[in-house]
Amino acid sequence: TVTFQAFFTADSTNTGTVSWVLAGVACADNDTINASFGTGVAPTAKAHSGTANDLDVTAESGAVTIAGSPSTDEEVYFQITRDVSADSLTADAKLLGIKLFFTTDAANDA
């Protein structure tokens, strides 16, 4: 599993909330890349600051389970969406990036 934080802004003084949802799927050699993503997870919807183009950072999400049983030498695809049914910002939210949190099995990458 992974968790994430979303970094976003809005060109608006609206103080509504924004909800970002992350889902993932792993694909191995000879797997179809038209695979279904796992269940999307969203951190608590974050209110925009009310100042146009301010940086807004969400809280860390709950665990996002990656579909496809990820393993060594597999590629992972992520899908991030805005869930407007769970937020209240009436302006366009602009996703700037995400911070992805994950645990590795090795102390180094050697």
Label each PLM-derived region with a short phrase:
Residues 1-10, 18, 98:
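A short beta-strand element within beta-rich, extracytoplasmic domains
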Residues 9-17, 28-30, 86-89:
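Extended, low-complexity, turn-rich repeat/linker tracts enriched in Gly/Pro/Ser/Thr and Asp/Glu
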Residues 1, 17, 71-75:
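Extracellular Ig-like/FN3 beta-sandwich strand-entry sites
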Residues 19-54:
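Beta-strand-rich interaction/scaffold domains
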Residues 55-86:
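Cysteine-clustered segments with highest specificity for TGF-beta superfamily mature ligands
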Residues 9, 43-51, 63-67:
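Beta-strand-rich interaction surfaces with strong enrichment in secreted/lumenal proteins
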Residues 5-11, 25, 103:
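Solvent-exposed strand-to-loop "edge" motifs in beta-rich extracellular domains
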Residues 81-110:
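Proprotein-processing/basic-patch segments
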